[in-house]
């Protein structure tokens, strides 16, 4: 499987960020909806797979669920969609390279976040609630338990957990930029995403599905949901824009530019 060098991945990420800014509004709206829906479908698959497993399996059942969750991000990357957590890295890198403005970044992040929320709520309401995929038997119990675990954490703990989450998610996106074929992209995405789910980190878009799914089932409140989403979003920004985007921009983009300048001098 062909794979780009890190400095080439950095340039690919910056180029991807610029392309995201240039998307026409109708495309951005539709792709943002799909991004939220795809992640929600991945989480729904997770719940349906592990909901009926024996409790005695303990963390093994969590690992099995984590192993199927990456389907969501694979759909985002290969089928095409806009996901705010990935944009926190690529669009930020375009900003760091001075190819876009802060205003353009803010507009992109705002629209994609709103559409991700709508997509995730769509899956939670129509598939989870109306069809009953998260509201019957052990699946309801699992949905509520997962949502409870997200909501029980303090603001600070959610924020820190979200940093770790998007560090791994954006590393998955980074690896997908590096791979030059579908198999390589799938492999690059799979393991970092499986890791964040198995660990139990906080992902803002995933939470936009699982917490509302529990709310539609009669548990928790929208106020609790908002109280979770705010620190999860902030932490995801730090994890994606700083721990991946900024660090790799410093490590590889400037180094690449200095090499070009040295060649011009020589």
Swiss-Prot record:
Pfam families xref list: Form_Nir_trans
Bilayer disposition of the protein: Multi-pass membrane protein
Q: What Gene3D superfamilies does its record include?
A: Glycerol uptake facilitator protein
Q: Which UniProt keywords apply?
A: Cell membrane, Membrane, Transmembrane, Transmembrane helix, Transport
Q: Does the keyword Transmembrane apply?
A: yes
What subcellular compartments does it reside in?
Answer: Cell membrane
What are the record's GO terms for cellular component?
A: plasma membrane
The family annotation for this protein states: Belongs to the FNT transporter (TC 1.A.16) family.
Instruction: Give yes or no: UniProt keyword Metal-binding.
Output: no
Which Gene Ontology molecular function entries are recorded, alphabetically?
formate transmembrane transporter activity
Membrane spanning residue stretches: 25-45, 64-84, 111-131, 158-178, 186-206, 209-229, 230-250
Give the GO terms filed under biological process for this record. Answer: formate transport
The record, for InterPro entries, names: Aquaporin-like, For/NO2_transpt, For/NO2_transpt_CS
Q: What is this protein called?
A: Uncharacterized transporter YrhG
Query: Which PROSITE patterns does the UniProt record give?
Result: FORMATE_NITRITE_TP_1 (PS01005), FORMATE_NITRITE_TP_2 (PS01006)
């Amino acid at each position: 499987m062909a794979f780009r060098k890190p400095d080439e991945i950095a340039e690919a990420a910056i180029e991807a960020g610029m392309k995201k800014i240039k998307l026409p509004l109708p495309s951005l709206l539709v792709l943002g909806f799909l991004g939220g829906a795809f992640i929600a479908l991945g989480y729904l698959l997770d719940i349906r797979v592990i909901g009926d497993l024996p409790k005695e399996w303990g963390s093994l059942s969590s690992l099995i669920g984590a192993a199927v969750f990456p389907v969501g991000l694979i759909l985002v990357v290969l089928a095409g969609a806009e996901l705010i957590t990935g944009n926190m890295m690529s669009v930020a890198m375009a900003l760091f390279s001075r190819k876009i403005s802060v205003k353009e970044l803010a507009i992109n992040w705002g629209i994609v976040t709103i559409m991700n929320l709508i997509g995730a709520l769509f899956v939670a309401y129509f598939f989870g609630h109306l069809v009953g995929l998260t509201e019957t038997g052990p699946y309801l119990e699992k949905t509520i338990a997962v949502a409870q675990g997200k909501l029980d954490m303090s603001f600070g703990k959610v924020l820190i957990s979200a940093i770790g989450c998007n560090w791994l998610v954006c590393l998955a996106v980074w690896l997908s930029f590096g791979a030059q074929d579908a198999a390589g992209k799938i492999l690059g995405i799979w393991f970092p995403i499986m890791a964040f789910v198995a660990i139990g980190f906080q992902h803002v878009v995933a939470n936009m599905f699982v917490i509302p799914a529990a709310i539609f089932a009669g548990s928790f409140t929208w106020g609790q949901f908002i109280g979770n989403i705010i620190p999860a979003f902030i932490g995801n920004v730090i994890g994606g824009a700083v721990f991946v985007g900024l660090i790799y921009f410093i490590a590889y983009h400037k180094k690449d530019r200095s090499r070009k300048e040295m060649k011009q001098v020589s």
